[in-house]
């Protein structure tokens, strides 16, 4: 041993059975273990690290809230429409009754006019009525009245137009003559204009304006 050691040497530093060696060995082993674990440590985050952290004064519940169910909170009787309320019928409304009555009156008037217009008219009756208009007195001069009458005869009476005319338009023409001979000049003119504007009767553009002029100037 060195010269400065004066006491008795009880334990040699290199003696395996000495406490110095054991403590030194343990310290060395623990140090090396710490170094190894520190060098091989990896950053592994669990679910606790990824979970949101609560703010100050906020407490997060681990179990999520159940979904909102309106049926468990709201009263079911609110959403059910009442069944004890009596709704008045549409037909019992006074305004609807008045409108229905007005519509019926208009329909009845239309049917009456249509029935009068659609009465059975024969070619002979229409021919006789047209001749009465031609031979009646008018506010026109005799020469003009005679000329217009001849045009009606030529384009309507002498060419078989009445025999080839459809029943609907024949009845229209019959109603025109009846209205003209009874003094309803404006209504008769409306019928003759309707026939002329329809344009389905043969040669209507030739005799309709002439007949209309005769009707307008009848001295009845």
UniProtKB/Swiss-Prot annotation:
One of its GO terms (cellular component) is nucleus. This is Uncharacterized protein C24H6.08. The lineage of its organism: Eukaryota, Fungi, Dikarya, Ascomycota, Taphrinomycotina.
